[in-house]
Design a protein with these regions (language model features):
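Winged helix-turn-helix DNA-binding recognition segment
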Residues: 17, 21-22, 32-87
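Pre-recognition alpha-helix immediately N-terminal to the DNA-recognition helix
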Residues: 25-29
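Long, low-complexity, charged/polar intrinsically disordered regions in eukaryotic proteins
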Residues: 1-13
């Protein structure tokens, strides 16, 4: 059995100029949380523990940018609760 290791240091998102640094940080957190999962769920409260200054609207706007640039797909199924899939 082969074990997968989490390595996001060489990911193409770091060189993408269309993505804001805050969105890159969110992507890295979501990537680590959803590692080896098809679909993951997250609440804005868990994100706010890591990124103190982010609001639900700011988080949603960053997810829209990431979705537009084909890094993930998300859906807000309740206020502050999201499910997402990383490509």
């Amino acid at each position: 059995m082969r074990v997968k290791h989490l390595d996001i240091s060489n990911h193409k998102i770091w060189k993408d100029k269309n993505i804001k640094p805050e969105a890159k940080e969110i992507y890295a957190y979501l990537f680590a949380e959803g590692f080896e999962r098809t679909i993951s769920h997250i609440s804005i409260g868990r994100i706010q523990r890591e990124l103190k200054s982010i609001t639900n609207i700011g988080f949603r706007n960053n997810l829209k940018i990431l979705e537009k640039n084909k890094y993930l797909v998300y859906k807000e199924y309740d206020t502050g609760l999201y499910k997402y899939h990383i490509y």
